[in-house]
């Protein structure tokens, strides 16, 4: 199930390389139209477009294709939930189930709905092991003491923000929080922090 950005392309390439049969559902106004062309190039079982509110249609497409495991790849702008989404009955029931409208609650409710229809929602990084950062220092230069202090401070702040389910990204400098992710997404908070 594809949102925006390069992540869906990476997942598609990796899953195909591993020999998986794929049915791709692109979210209209989110997923890149090039994803349909790439899917055709890989001779996938099928490619379908749904609007953000068509969870029932998405489930119908997947169950008809015999899908028992699905993953979501790519961002879906949360602001879209508050403007112009026309939810189908399945989406309405799913939104009603979510106690809040933050990311964790929404994804959990969607996962539960998929599960009720025999579709397990799997980790979006399942096929991307070689592309994920390994634990530890990623540069050839050791961190300074000030950078280590910022890193520890940043970890504690990010952990606190994540517990509140506000976002997953923060930027810090000299033990001050410069920017916190909210609904605008990771890329936007990084760009904003760079401007500050």
Residue ranges and their predicted role:
Residues 1, 25-26, 70-74, 172-173:
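Short beta-strand segments
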Residues 26-51:
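N-terminal beta-loop-helix "entrance" segment that forms/cooperates
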Residues 18-21, 44, 65-68, 116-119, ...:
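Short coil/turn connectors at secondary-structure junctions
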Residues 55-128:
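N-terminal glycine-rich phosphate/adenylate-binding segment common to multiple enzyme folds
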Residues 12, 58-68, 190-196:
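Short amphipathic alpha-helices and their capping/turn segments at secondary-structure boundaries
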Residues 1-27, 53:
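N-terminal basic/disordered segments at the start of proteins
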Residues 4, 75-78, 176:
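Short glycine-rich anion-binding loops that position phosphate/pyrophosphate groups of nucleotides
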